[in-house]
Amino acid sequence: MLRVLSRRFYCKIAAKTNFKTAKLDFKELRYATKVPQTPVDTVFPETNANRVEIDAKTIQLLERLSLVNLDSEQALATLNSSIQFADKIAHINTENVRPLYTVLENQQLQLRNDEVKEGDCRVELLRNAKVTDEDYYVSPPGNIPLEQ
């Protein structure tokens, strides 16, 4: 109950605050953008496994779960390089790095007023779907291959 009240209190304060006049202050940033201006060489720690061996049973499982054919050598090479890259990322030291919710979490973002422009168009929206059930969209199951 306290959480709901505090959320409502914050919403009232945020609604009174004029965010439209607040602009993003990029002077606090080291650069004008988070993207480096010049290429940065990233050195990953060397791992012992240069090539990961994947057995046929695991490949069949991955094909069934992801609905991607891994028949060609190029697909297996891409899978292998992705696993190697994930292994390198797993060994990066992030001990003193604070997690971010967003890149601009210390900046005020502009909010717009919530205005209903169109409403009660449920029937028109449901006409766009191939299959509906009781005012819901029905999507195909993800674990069954589609007919080609």
Curated annotation (Swiss-Prot):
Record field: catalytic activity: L-glutamyl-tRNA(Gln) + L-glutamine + ATP + H2O = L-glutaminyl-tRNA(Gln) + L-glutamate + ADP + phosphate + H(+)
Domain of life: Eukaryota
Localization terms from the record: Mitochondrion
Record-linked Pfam families: GatC
Cystines in this chain: none
GO-annotated cellular components: glutamyl-tRNA(Gln) amidotransferase complex; mitochondrion
GO BP annotations listed: glutaminyl-tRNAGln biosynthesis via transamidation; mitochondrial translation; regulation of translational fidelity
Tagged with keyword ATP-binding: yes
Oligomer and partners: Subunit of the heterotrimeric GatCAB amidotransferase (AdT) complex, composed of A, B and C subunits.
Biological function: Allows the formation of correctly charged Gln-tRNA(Gln) through the transamidation of misacylated Glu-tRNA(Gln) in the mitochondria. The reaction takes place in the presence of glutamine and ATP through an activated gamma-phospho-Glu-tRNA(Gln).
Family: Belongs to the GatC family.
Name of the protein: Glutamyl-tRNA(Gln) amidotransferase subunit C, mitochondrial
Organism of this sequence: Drosophila pseudoobscura pseudoobscura
